[in-house]
UniProtKB/Swiss-Prot annotation:
Name used for this protein in its record: UPF0756 membrane protein NT01CX_1209
Higher taxonomy: Bacteria, Bacillati, Bacillota, Clostridia, Eubacteriales
Gene Ontology CC: one annotated term: plasma membrane
The family this protein is said to belong to: Belongs to the UPF0756 family.
Subcellular location: Cell membrane
InterPro entries given in the database record: UPF0756_TM
Matches recorded under HAMAP family: UPF0756 (MF_01874)
Length: 153
């Protein structure tokens, strides 16, 4: 029952913050929670991250087919701003890849990332791609802390 209350709170926050993605996600999950079908939940858990990444990648590739001059504009990407954007894109992609494994590592990691991402999305106007990046950054921070203090966080 507590999971339904949390979902209702999130749905309320999504409407207040006008975050359609969080609103739709909470409505879908609330609906599914009433049926408690383990097969459906397991399927979503196993496949939805990859499906979401695929849709995000499709969205990122739209300019290639939408803009006929895209290939000509590639040379313009090698100015200072373009190089900084290229490096940030590469770094974030690597951090996100570290985050995938880190999210699966433990429940305290997953809970903290989820709560932080929900606050970021619902109250601070963020977008819901944060969990992978946040967990990748968290992975690197924990790795550095472990190196410095010889600790096992």
């Amino acid at each position: 029952m507590s999971s339904k209350i949390i979902l209702l709170i999130l749905m309320f926050l999504s409407f207040i913050s006008k975050n359609k993605s969080l609103g739709i996600a909470t409505i879908v999950m609330l609906f599914i929670s009433f049926f408690n079908t383990e097969k459906c939940i397991t399927f979503m858990e196993n496949h939805f991250m990859n499906l979401g990444m695929t849709f995000l990648m499709i969205w990122m590739l739209i300019p290639i087919i939408k803009n006929p001059e895209f290939t000509e504009n590639i040379k313009n990407a090698f100015n200072l701003k373009g190089i900084v954007c290229f490096l940030c894109g590469a770094i974030v992609a690597v951090l996100a890849s570290k985050g995938v494994g880190f999210l699966k590592g433990s429940t305290d990691t997953l809970t903290g990332i989820i709560l932080g991402s929900i606050v970021g999305v619902s109250l601070l106007g963020g977008v819901p791609v944060g969990p992978l990046i946040a967990s990748g950054i968290a992975y690197e921070v924990v790795f550095i802390i472990n190196l410095i203090f010889k600790n096992n966080c």
